[in-house]
């Protein structure tokens, strides 16, 4: 929304060097708000104010077609699939980006309170799997995306859907990566958790950054590449959860490199 919260987030993104050219500021609707309660161990509980939020009101005609046609990776979550018109806008953006050669990256980022019920969440979360190239799931999200809570079986299900690069994060257990008929485990970096907010985003940001730098298509990525990408993701997440907040906790690339080389 074009309100104090929306303007704050736009400015924060720009300070971080993020291109906001495709951002749409709705003058009539409020920015959705997320509140995070932390346990002593740094685990989170979410609540939202969103009735409706400006994010759910994004219309297909507001999409920046030039940006979509010139992107290398189009990243999407399931939050924009919870309501119309953002659901239709998400689909149009996905089809446009995919048809012009972008790799489609997907982090369901399941938030129970944003869905009418689990069945609706499952239907929508799984609906876009056939056009996804890269996916990151947490253990908690496996039943919604793959219909099973077993890592090996979930990977098989996602392979059958045609997903080329699969990542399942396991918290302190690190991550499992898979491509083709191969899979590997990648250990986490030890750390004292202060706040796990943003850990998944930090991991996938590090992973996707390395994927883009590789210059490879999703079909040329080897299992060794996947391990390398995931190590960067694990290092990024480790630094993130050692700090408080969703945005201030994000580390720099220099910090990640130092941890990887330490």
Regions picked out by a protein language model, each given a short descriptive name:
Residues 73, 79-157, 163, 173-174:
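Conserved beta-alpha-beta core of the PfkB/ribokinase-like small-molecule kinase fold
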Residues 95-96, 147-262:
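Conserved phosphate-binding/catalytic region of the ribokinase-like
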Residues 26, 77, 138, 169, ...:
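Conserved residues at the C-terminal ends of beta-strands
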């Amino acid at each position: 929304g074009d309100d104090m919260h929306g303007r704050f987030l736009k400015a924060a993104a720009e300070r971080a060097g993020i291109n906001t050219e495709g951002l749409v500021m709705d003058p009539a609707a409020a920015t959705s708000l997320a509140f995070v309660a932390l346990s002593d161990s740094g685990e989170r509980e979410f609540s939202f104010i969103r009735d409706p939020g400006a994010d759910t009101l994004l219309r297909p005609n507001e999409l920046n077609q030039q940006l979509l046609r010139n992107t290398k990776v189009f990243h999407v979550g399931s939050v924009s699939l919870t309501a119309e018109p953002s659901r239709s806008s998400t689909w149009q953006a996905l089809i446009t980006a995919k048809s012009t050669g972008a790799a489609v990256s997907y982090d369901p980022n399941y938030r129970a309170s944003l869905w009418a019920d689990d069945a609706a969440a499952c239907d929508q979360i799984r609906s876009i799997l056939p056009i996804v190239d890269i996916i990151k799931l947490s253990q908690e999200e496996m039943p919604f995306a793959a219909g099973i809570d077993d890592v090996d079986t979930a990977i098989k299900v996602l392979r059958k859907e045609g997903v080329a690069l699969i990542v399942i994060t396991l918290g302190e257990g690190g991550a499992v990566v898979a491509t083709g008929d191969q899979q590997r485990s990648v250990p986490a970096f030890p750390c004292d958790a202060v706040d796990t907010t943003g850990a998944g985003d930090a991991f996938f940001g590090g992973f996707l950054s390395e994927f883009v730098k590789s210059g490879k298509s999703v079909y040329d990525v080897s299992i060794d590449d996947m391990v390398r990408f995931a190590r960067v993701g694990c290092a990024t997440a480790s630094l993130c959860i050692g700090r408080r907040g969703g945005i201030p906790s994000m580390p720099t690339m220099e910090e990640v490199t130092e941890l990887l080389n330490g």
